[in-house]
């Protein structure tokens, strides 16, 4: 037995998202992706008194040529602990901007969180798109594993949370746990600084006079959309009278708003993020009295908007996407688990999540969560890995086919990992074997990245090596993880 929205998260969050992002994709989820219950927001407008992270620090430092000023557009501010319907925190505060410079170590903004407990926290940044915003705003995340650099295109994605990554931070306020935005850029223009959020947190949207009392990642998309600054028509089409229908529709409308004015949704207003496709992973109801596998169903919609998507593409592109996904899932599950996994059908039906998106979209009804034969595999982490990899490969195939490009599938995880003391003093010899994938001829390992963690810290940014072995220097008495 399982709850559908939590069960499908167990495929998406630990498996599919990392696979897509490791392959270079930019991914958005309409529900909170971080399972961390704690949340700290550091903002130029200050922290809410008595709220988590009240010891956090924001500061901005000017240079000789660039100083920080307040933007003319509103920014984020957390003025309340609990938000009512149609209250937008991204219209409650201010944001800061500075002119760019080509030299390093000039003007910068700094967000230092007061972390309530040691652990892993997703890091989200926010900013306003301004005249002259650059496409290479330089963010540095200082975490327990070191420093990780990101370049963010501030010409798109204004006034919402932009996910950078998930990192380990120690409890308290530390100079090795913070986010820095530099005004260094190859482009002449401005960078903008607004709130930075650490951790997924607890739900803070009140319905019926109270909040859910649940971590935000367990809540519906309607409530996350409000916290993420979406306009009311995106998440409140039923004006607070039918949250279930709003929760279904907001998933598509959020994609449309984020992609509005981009190449893939040029006809709608929005934030200009070029999302190319949308996939909803569901589990289905129903059971077999004969204890047979029910299997996977694909859903798409062609009979809408005169058969066209918003970029003018034929809506049968959604059928292509659905077909590729079902074909890959059936092939990989059958080959890996030696079961007669069923490809049920491709439905051309009128569903919100396949009708409303401006881009090619599909629903994958993976299996029946009421059917024992399906759920014998459903909770197996090896099955979840196989499903995640099949979905990743299908999406890769679809995107590359749309662009007329060849694709290479990322290799499988290594095996036979071993650690031995090195020939030189205070060294370790790491060795492993690259895994060939019998299902994917392109998935051949050519290079590897070795990540190191010292003590109970976080993993570093890794070292790329060309052979299945690596020598590392160590200090006696310290625990190392790889």
Label every model-predicted segment.
Residues 1, 215-319, 347-370:
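Active-site microenvironments of hydrolase-like enzyme catalytic domains
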Residues 94, 99, 195-203, 283-307, ...:
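Active-site-adjacent mobile loop/cap segments within catalytic or ligand-binding domains
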Residues 95-97, 107-131:
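A short beta-strand element within beta-rich, extracytoplasmic domains
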Residues 129-148:
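Short, surface-exposed beta-strand/strand-loop-strand elements in extracellular ectodomains
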Residues 144-174:
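Extracellular carbohydrate recognition and processing domains
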Residues 179-190:
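Short beta-strand-plus-loop segments that form exposed binding edges in beta-rich domains
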Residues 398-442:
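Pro/Thr/Ser/Gly-rich low-complexity, intrinsically disordered linker/stalk tracts
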Residues 471-482:
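Beta-strand-rich modules
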């Amino acid at each position: 037995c399982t709850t559908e929205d939590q069960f499908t998260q167990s495929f998406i969050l630990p498996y599919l998202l990392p696979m897509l992002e490791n392959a270079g994709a930019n991914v958005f989820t309409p529900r909170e992706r971080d399972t961390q219950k704690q949340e700290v927001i550091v903002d130029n407008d200050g922290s809410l008194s008595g709220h988590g992270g009240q010891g956090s620090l924001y500061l901005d430092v000017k240079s000789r040529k660039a100083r920080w000023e307040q933007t003319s557009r509103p920014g984020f501010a957390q003025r309340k602990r609990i938000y009512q319907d149609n209250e937008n925190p991204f219209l409650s505060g201010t944001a800061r901007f500075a002119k760019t410079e080509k030299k390093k170590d000039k003007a910068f903004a700094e967000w230092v969180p007061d972390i309530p407990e040691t652990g892993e926290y997703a890091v989200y940044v926010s900013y306003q798109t301004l005249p002259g915003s650059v496409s290479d705003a330089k963010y540095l995340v200082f975490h327990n594993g070191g420093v990780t650099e990101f370049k963010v295109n501030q010409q798109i994605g204004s006034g919402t949370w932009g996910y950078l990554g998930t990192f380990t931070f120690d409890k308290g306020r530390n100079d090795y746990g913070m986010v820095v935005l530099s005004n260094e850029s190859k482009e002449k223009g401005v960078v903008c600084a607004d709130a930075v959020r650490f951790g997924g947190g607890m739900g803070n949207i009140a319905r019926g006079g109270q909040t859910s009392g649940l971590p935000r990642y367990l809540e519906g998309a309607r409530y996350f959309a409000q916290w993420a600054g979406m306009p009311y028509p995106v998440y409140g089409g039923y004006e607070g009278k039918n949250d279930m229908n709003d929760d279904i529709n907001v998933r598509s409308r959020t994609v449309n708003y984020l992609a509005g004015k981009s190449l893939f949704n040029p006809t709608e207003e929005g934030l200009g993020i070029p999302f190319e496709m949308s996939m909803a992973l569901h589990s289905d109801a129903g059971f077999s009295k004969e204890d047979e596998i029910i299997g996977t169903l694909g859903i798409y919609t062609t009979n809408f908007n005169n058969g066209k998507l918003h970029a003018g593409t034929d809506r049968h592109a959604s059928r292509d996407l659905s077909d590729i996904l079902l074909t890959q899932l059936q092939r990989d599950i059958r080959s890996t688990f030696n079961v007669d996994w069923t490809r049920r059908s491709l439905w051309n039906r009128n569903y919100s999540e396949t009708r409303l998106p401006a881009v090619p979209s599909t629903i994958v009804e993976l299996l029946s969560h009421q059917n024992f034969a399906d759920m014998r595999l459903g909770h197996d982490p090896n099955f979840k890995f196989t499903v995640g990899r099949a979905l990743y490969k299908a999406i890769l195939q679809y995107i590359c086919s749309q662009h007329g490009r060849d694709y290479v599938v990322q290799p499988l995880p290594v095996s036979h990992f071993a650690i031995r003391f090195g020939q030189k003093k205070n060294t370790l010899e790491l060795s492993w074997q690259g895994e060939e994938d019998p299902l994917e001829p392109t998935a051949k390992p050519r290079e590897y990245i070795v990540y190191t963690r010292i003590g109970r810290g976080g993993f570093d940014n890794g070292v790329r090596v060309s052979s299945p072995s690596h020598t590392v220097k160590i200090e006696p008495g310290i625990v190392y993880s790889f």
